[in-house]
UniProtKB/Swiss-Prot annotation:
One of its GO terms (cellular component) is cell surface. The gene is Synj2bp. It comes from Rattus norvegicus. One of its GO terms (molecular function) is type II activin receptor binding. The chain crosses the membrane at residues 118-138. Widely expressed. This is Synaptojanin-2-binding protein. InterPro entries: PDZ (IPR001478), PDZ_sf (IPR036034), Synaptic_Scaffolding_LAP-MAGUK (IPR050614). Residues 1-117 are cytoplasmic. The keyword Transport does not apply.
Amino acid sequence: MNGRVDYLVSEEEINLTRGPSGLGFNIVGGTDQQYVSNDSGIYVSRIKEDGAAARDGRLQEGDKILSVNGQDLKNLLHQDAVDLFRNAGYAVSLRVQHRLPVQNGPIVHRGDGEPSGVPVAVVLLPVFALTLVAVWAFVRYRKQL
């Protein structure tokens, strides 16, 4: 094992309605205070209980926010990003990047048309290898008789 964690990355559009406590989450990052090494993106650092984001349930701590109401968050100072969120209005559209760690083990069935187990090649390859070894051993044994 190399100690590296692989991730699946997915993007999602999340629409939130501002509540009494705002959008219900805190952010970190920006060009002046990078949260992730070599990445000046804006990340969710905390979801506030009973806030708009917590009630919606899709935004998670660690998610990268790519845009707010269509405005790209690349190369912004942290305070400029905060101001953009504060002035985004009542209905806010977020383009979010989720990073999900890849888990080892069999794929779980999720529904029609989706992967439902171990890929066929993973099963057939060892069976094929064992068959070749058995045939080789049989041929060698027969030559000795």
